[in-house]
Amino acid sequence: MPLRPDRTARLLPALLAAWLCLAPAAAEERAPAVELTVYTTAEQEHLRLYKDAFEKANPGIHIHWVRNASGVLTDRLLAEREAGGADAVWGLAATSLIRLGREGLLLPYAPAGLEAIDPRFRDTADTPAWIGTNIWSSVVCLNRAAHPGVPAPTAWRDLADPAFRGLVSMPNPLSSGTGYLMVAGWIQMMGEEEAWRFMDALDLNVETYAISASKPCRMAAVGRVAAGLSFEYRAAQLKAEGAPIDILLPAEGLGWDMEAAAVLRWTDAPEAARRLMDFAASEAANRLYATNYAIVAHTGVTPSLEFLPPGLKDRLLAQDIAWASDNRERILAEWRRRYGAKVEEP
């Protein structure tokens, strides 16, 4: 039966209201998802955790990770300055981001909640080019169960003892940010001349300069070397799994760097990339970082990492990460000249 005109008139407002409610939802369903290509050095086992948490908080934005070592990604970003590539970085060394910022490759942005980020964990500009997420530092993984003849070192210089001949591994600083923070830390701690003398003596004991920061500690865990120079997360994780290692914090101090996040200048999805930055700086994200690292950027989050010796925060060197960034190419060129023959091939 046809509707009477008066009834039709009464129904039209309700139908229009229903259509207005449904149309945005339908349009949202039809809108294609945005995919962000994000360069990272974060540990493989952390990437799914970060991706799932971000995508749950930001429906319609998907992360495509590209993971590699810090030095490799830094060189790649410098090479991509004209053609572009990634949209953002999340988990790249601050020493790298300082350089990328000075080269004009970053898009400054003040993420939501910036006021809760420790000022030491961000670019100093009013609108920061990058923000830090967590600190990671150098440690020594020692396996005396497999190598009872080696002494227990209390200082970095102790690793030059001939008792460690062929029984030390450290990350290759040409590819690994952890390797570079060790070298830059020794130079700032000892002075250049003394630091190169120490590294000459250490090189006599090094079995290999490993391609990744995790590998030296893994090598110590299985007894391939006695001392694996690595970083605190991997050391604590392997010890939690039952590896027969002691985690040592050398008395002179620990080199360190920050993992950090930034939007890249050439991104085709700047709004989505800014939402990534908002999440990277959030308390929720920092609670994820705090399950893996001893020091995070958010002032309202206190990590508690099992199996690490007490006092790690107090052992961090009072180092200048801007200096480490500015001198990276010079230091690495000299390091390659002296020790490149022992670098592990990919």
Model-derived regions: residue spans:
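Bacterial N-terminal signal peptides
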Residues: 11-23
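Early extracytoplasmic/lumenal segment of secretory-pathway proteins
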Residues: 28-98
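Extracytoplasmic ligand-binding site segments that recognize negatively charged/polar headgroups
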Residues: 41-48, 71, 85-224
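Periplasmic-binding protein-like
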Residues: 116-120, 136, 198-203, 209-210, ...
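A bilobed periplasmic-binding-protein/Venus flytrap-type ligand-binding module shared by bacterial periplasmic
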Residues: 141-146, 184, 257-269, 288-289
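Mature extracytoplasmic/periplasmic domains
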Residues: 264-319
